[in-house]
């Protein structure tokens, strides 16, 4: 078995009393305060999503994604009462990928579901993810293979966070992130992978002008003749 080491963790924090065990050890410095509430309110539901990435000693990478839904009150289901704080859904998807973001293995598991004995039977179908590439229409291909009644809506939704989680894991490990004078991009003709992938890092923007001056492209204004 390949040895793995954790590389990156992306976590949504949930309230302490309802926090599933695998969310409780998140360092305090990673916690985000809520935006100001516009009216008085009561907490009803928490959906927590966590992704861990591991670099394996065989050169591959594991992405482990988990989704947990909990309620703040006892919740009646067709199959019985789910107590406050007990997961209504607790599901996991693990992809093994190479450095080209090709999926070489895929596994899914449902540990808590609203309909035990039924929901979890679809897990093996998530092996259909093998052969996909996280940067080549991954979400569309997942919908085609596992959307609607072809899969579990929650497992399928969970896969949607994996492309960007993989890119964050690869940053500084597989993808070079340095800039400024003397960086790797000055020694090669390779454009930094993160440019032109969001509004802040557009090639004609001030952030690129400051941090990636070599790749800055000023926007040329066109003048209409009268």
Task: Label each region the model flagged.
Residues 1-8, 12-14, 26:
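Short hydrophobic transmembrane-like helices used for membrane targeting/insertion
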Residues 6, 17-19, 37:
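Generic early N-terminus positional signal peaking at residue ~5-7
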Residues 34, 69-226:
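Active-site- and interface-proximal helix/loop "cap" or "latch" segments in soluble metabolic
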Residues 36-63, 68-80:
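N-terminal intrinsically disordered, cationic/polar leader segments
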